């Protein structure tokens, strides 16, 4: 089977067009030449898209089922937390004298211990905020205030005030229900 010069030109022109394939694609080309003439040629082109960031993000997110629970099944145990506050603050500060550096460190330590003991109660879906203030007891007055936006049906707090001969301490635990 002989090809005319015109048909050879069209085949060569068609082959040149197929040669411009993007570097992202996979292509193969086979050609057999016998005595300088093209005997058979075949070309396949496949294309693969690059994965986009949007595809990766949609695969990584985990959808959780709605619980349709609007309030806590078990309310925050304020009385139990009051006992924890009293025990921890009293045990740490009963015999201490006021020293600024020591009290600065004690506020951090006491708040971490209180938070750990309240978390051990395993009350689900409550966010805990623990704040401890320690100051020198020297015939001065102090006003400590806190403000928060919360639901009075489910959110609550617990507070304890401690005094000895040289210092005072105020420990607060705020419990905010996560819906």
Curated annotation (Swiss-Prot):
GO molecular function per UniProt: dynein intermediate chain binding
Domain of life: Eukaryota
Pfam name, any one: Tctex-1
GO cellular component: cytoplasm; cytoplasmic dynein complex
UniProt record, GO biological process: microtubule-based movement
Similarity annotation: Belongs to the dynein light chain Tctex-type family.
Subunit organization: Interacts with ZMYND10.
Protein name: Dynein light chain Tctex-type 5
Organism of derivation: Homo sapiens
Gene encoding the protein: DYNLT5
């Amino acid at each position: 089977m002989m090809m005319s010069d015109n048909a050879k030109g069209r085949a060569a022109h068609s082959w040149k067009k197929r040669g411009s394939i993007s570097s992202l694609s996979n292509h193969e080309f086979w050609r057999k030449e016998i005595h300088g003439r093209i005997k058979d040629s075949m070309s396949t082109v496949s294309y693969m898209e690059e994965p986009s960031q949007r595809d990766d993000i949609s695969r990584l997110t985990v959808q959780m089922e709605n619980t349709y629970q609007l309030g806590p099944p078990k309310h925050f145990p304020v009385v139990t937390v009051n006992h924890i506050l009293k025990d921890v603050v009293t045990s740490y500060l009963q015999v201490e004298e006021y020293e600024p550096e020591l009290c600065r460190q004690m506020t951090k330590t006491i708040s971490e211990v209180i938070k750990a003991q309240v978390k051990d109660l395993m009350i689900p879906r409550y966010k805990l905020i623990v704040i401890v203030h320690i100051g020198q007891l020297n015939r001065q007055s102090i006003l400590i205030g806190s403000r928060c936006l919360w639901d009075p049906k489910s959110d609550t707090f617990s507070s304890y005030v401690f005094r000895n001969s040289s210092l005072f301490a105020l420990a607060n635990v705020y419990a905010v229900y996560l819906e």
